[in-house]
Amino acid sequence: MIKVAAAGGGTGGHLYPLLAILETLAKRVDVKVLFFAVKGKIDERVVRKDHPEFETVSIDVRGLLRPLHHPKNLWRTLKIGIATIEVKKHLKRFKPDLVVLTGGYISGVVGLAAKDLGIPIFVHEQNVVPGLAVKVLSQYAKKVFVSFERTRDYLREWQDKIVVTGCPVRETEKEAPLKDFVLVLGGSLGSEAINELMEKVYPELQETQFVHSTGSDDWTERLSVFPNVTALTYIDPMGAYWKKAIASISRAGASTIAEMMYYGVPGILIPWESSAESHQLENALEAERLGYAIVIRENEASPRKIIESIDKVVKKGKIEKMKENPASKISKEILGEIM
């Protein structure tokens, strides 16, 4: 048995790749997991539901505001210090063989605590541009797994640690009850802008079937009036629908792009440009460069442009599915280092 401590939460973009890694590790060896979740965030809820066998510890911590000299960061830095002491106590008790981190502020806390205790650290960065936690933790990590080759440019000092794997995707045996549809997503909390845009598109494309994850019951009711739209407040598991989709329309979070590329679904990406350090725009442009997507900037998005782009991606057809889940590559690398 190996004991793994893990953190990477606050958003689905950090959480789901981490769960994919842990679930793949568990298929290869007997694993006991200590999971550090952010109190009140998605990881706390999802991990307790999907993995009751994990020991889940909720930590009350919030990330630093931008710019970093923001006056509220003094209080947040104090809370990070308190949280680090709490995490150290749990790590000393659990005695993990390694720590797996996928970014976000909770990763910074757990990673620095693990570094002080001499626990091997493995990091994964989902985005093209690494976040602050990954930049800091890369110097202490045994391996730094990245989704894109271009991420090397942002971590030049740690080239010998970097392994380009792609972004892990959670596997599922489930199948969507529909097929040959355009999948519309706005992230785990939905997207008002995408919902409003698609409400104007649907009447113009009545021969095309859509499955739309709305993020709210109000929007689900509102979009259900269109006979060519299956509106769902939340889709779980996502993989069941990606398997059957012929195209997609979404924001450009790393997990969404990872699933799009893994299942070979061409997409239209409308990046959320207020995301930290322009992560989504950089992710979208890289997916477009690799031939998986058409990028439409939000200030340029119109129903006509979306309709024209849907026609292009549907005609392009599905791309060959990846032969190996990046989660599998990562689990092999980790086990090769510690076994």
UniProtKB/Swiss-Prot annotation:
- E.C. no: 2.4.1.227
Q: Which intervals of the chain form a coiled coil?
A: none
One Gene Ontology cellular component annotation? plasma membrane
Molecular function terms in GO for this entry?
A: glycosyltransferase activity; UDP-N-acetyl-D-glucosamine:N-acetylmuramoyl-L-alanyl-D-glutamyl-meso-2,6-diaminopimelyl-D-alanyl-D-alanine-diphosphoundecaprenol 4-beta-N-acetylglucosaminlytransferase activity; undecaprenyldiphospho-muramoylpentapeptide beta-N-acetylglucosaminyltransferase activity
Per UniProt, UDP-N-acetyl-alpha-D-glucosamine binds at T11, G12, G13, N127, R170, S188, I235, Q280
Q: How is this protein positioned relative to the membrane?
A: Peripheral membrane protein
Pathway assignment: Cell wall biogenesis; peptidoglycan biosynthesis
- Please write the reaction equations for the catalytic activity of this protein: di-trans,octa-cis-undecaprenyl diphospho-N-acetyl-alpha-D-muramoyl-L-alanyl-D-glutamyl-meso-2,6-diaminopimeloyl-D-alanyl-D-alanine + UDP-N-acetyl-alpha-D-glucosamine = di-trans,octa-cis-undecaprenyl diphospho-[N-acetyl-alpha-D-glucosaminyl-(1->4)]-N-acetyl-alpha-D-muramoyl-L-alanyl-D-glutamyl-meso-2,6-diaminopimeloyl-D-alanyl-D-alanine + UDP + H(+)
Keywords, A to Z, come to:
Cell cycle, Cell division, Cell inner membrane, Cell membrane, Cell shape, Cell wall biogenesis/degradation, Glycosyltransferase, Membrane, Peptidoglycan synthesis, Transferase
NCBIfam families named among the record's database cross-references: murG
Q: Which family does it belong to?
A: Belongs to the glycosyltransferase 28 family. MurG subfamily.
What is this protein identified as? Answer: UDP-N-acetylglucosamine--N-acetylmuramyl-(pentapeptide) pyrophosphoryl-undecaprenol N-acetylglucosamine transferase
Protein species of origin: Thermotoga maritima (strain ATCC 43589 / DSM 3109 / JCM 10099 / NBRC 100826 / MSB8)
**Lineage, top ranks:** Bacteria, Thermotogati, Thermotogota, Thermotogae, Thermotogales
Gene expressing this chain? murG
